[in-house]
């Protein structure tokens, strides 16, 4: 079961998280420079194996427990494809409460692996905003990080989106 921890007291399944409407109210959503939003991530070994299979990543390091034990990682690690999917989905989930959104660019740097049964914090911060929502659209640039509980950066990311009044 994929778990996204919205806060310490509450855990919900990955699939249910993105169906929820109450993760953040419209009044809490902002496109101000410096605004950030975050979620906690905790994946089990079974989650990692299932997600790698679901996204078509057949690298043994994501599903073969025996072979992965003999690697520098010492066990199964999450697929970059799967992590980037979960992580990037935070952006439309956040912004779609206030405007229509189109993704324009996204890049990831995987600094360290995502291991099972460790809690990670995924966050995005708005770096710049340009344009007009009712005109050609607002271009929003974001930077993001995924960090472990010791604040070690596992993943760094950049994204550029467009917010529009209508699609």
Where are these regions (language model features)?
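Catalytic strand-loop segment that frames the active site of acyl-thioester-processing enzymes
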Residues: 3-78
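HotDog/MaoC-like acyl-thioester-processing domains
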Residues: 3-36, 114-119, 123-167
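Generic structural detector for well-ordered beta-strands
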Residues: 38-42, 109, 160-162
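Sparse recognition of residues in long alpha-helices and their boundaries
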Residues: 67, 103, 133-134
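Hydrophobic beta-strand-centered segment that forms part of the acyl-chain substrate-binding groove
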Residues: 71-78, 85-128, 158
């Amino acid at each position: 079961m994929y778990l996204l921890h919205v806060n310490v007291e509450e855990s919900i399944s990955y699939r249910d998280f993105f169906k929820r409407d109450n993760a953040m109210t419209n009044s809490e959503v902002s496109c101000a420079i410096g605004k950030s939003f975050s979620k906690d991530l905790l994946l089990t070994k079974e989650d990692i194996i299932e997600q790698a299979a679901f996204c078509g990543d057949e690298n043994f390091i994501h599903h073969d427990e025996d072979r992965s034990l003999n690697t520098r990682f010492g066990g199964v690690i999450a697929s970059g494809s799967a992590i980037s999917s979960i992580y990037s989905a935070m952006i439309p989930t956040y912004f779609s409460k206030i405007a229509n959104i189109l993704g324009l660019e996204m890049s990831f740097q995987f600094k360290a692996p995502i291991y099972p049964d460790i809690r990670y914090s995924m966050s995005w911060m708005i770096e710049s905003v340009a344009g007009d929502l009712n005109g050609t659209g607002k271009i929003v640039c974001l930077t993001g990080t995924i960090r472990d509980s010791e604040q070690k950066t596992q993943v760094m990311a950049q994204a550029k989106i467009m917010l529009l009044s209508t699609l």
